[in-house]
């Protein structure tokens, strides 16, 4: 398949692992990737990508971030992604966000006067990486406590662990009566295009009411994330 696509002259191919929910009764049997099979697939994708770099000067074949997470492999550096041509498809999203946060923090003045706590909810897959990114923000804003909470996807179940499929109901169930601080942030990918309804038809207002907290919706942009987190109380 890789060779066939290469012959067609495609500009870029993104390869992502299948995500299986608990709602698969009567459907074609599919096997979810584990650490071993994810690593094998990743080796194959990177092999073809490296060959394309030698032939054409560009990678063409990219693996989704989830393959690196499942294979327990480090996320490649930003240069690997050649300008992030498929970041919206989950290709290099973690590396891109981290780089943007680093640039935004580098341009920020040191400020230890801001003193408050916020919570950032996300899917289980990205939580460890997001926690590391929040440490970068802490280098310039040491008294802002940013608590990253991984939300288990009980609604879809199975191996679904990405932020974009977290539902409002799961947010409410898992964050109820928790100390969330002064604001709760979520990525905009959790919401439908109107940016006010989750996939389970729970609204932003429902979550704010049930958790008694203001909800901040942040796009997958490091500069915006740093700005939002550091301006809760100015």
Q: Could you tell me what each predicted segment is?
A:
Residues 3-14, 19-234:
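Auxiliary Fe-S-binding modules of radical SAM enzymes
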């Amino acid at each position: 398949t890789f060779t066939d696509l290469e012959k067609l002259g495609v500009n870029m191919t993104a390869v992502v692992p299948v995500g299986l929910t608990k709602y698969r009764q009567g459907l074609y049997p599919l096997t979810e990737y584990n650490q071993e099979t994810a690593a094998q697939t990743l080796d194959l994708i990177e092999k073809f990508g490296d060959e394309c770099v030698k032939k054409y000067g560009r990678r063409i074949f990219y693996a989704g971030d989830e393959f690196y997470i499942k294979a327990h492999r480090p996320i490649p550096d930003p240069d690997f992604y050649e300008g992030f041509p498929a970041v919206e498809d989950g290709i290099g999203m973690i590396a891109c966000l981290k780089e943007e946060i680093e640039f935004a923090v580098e341009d920020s003045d040191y400020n230890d006067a801001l003193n408050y706590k916020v919570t950032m909810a996300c899917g289980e897959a990205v939580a460890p990486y997001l926690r590391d990114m929040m440490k970068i923000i802490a280098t310039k804003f040491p008294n802002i406590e940013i608590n990253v909470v991984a939300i288990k996807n009980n609604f879809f179940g199975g191996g679904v662990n990405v932020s974009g499929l977290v539902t409002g109901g799961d947010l409410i169930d898992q964050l109820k009566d928790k100390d969330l601080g002064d604001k709760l942030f979520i990525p905009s990918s959790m919401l439908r295009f109107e940016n006010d309804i989750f996939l389970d038809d729970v609204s932003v207002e429902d979550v704010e009411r049930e958790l008694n907290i203001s909800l901040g919706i942040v796009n997958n942009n490091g500069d915006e994330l740093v700005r939002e987190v550091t301006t809760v109380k100015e």
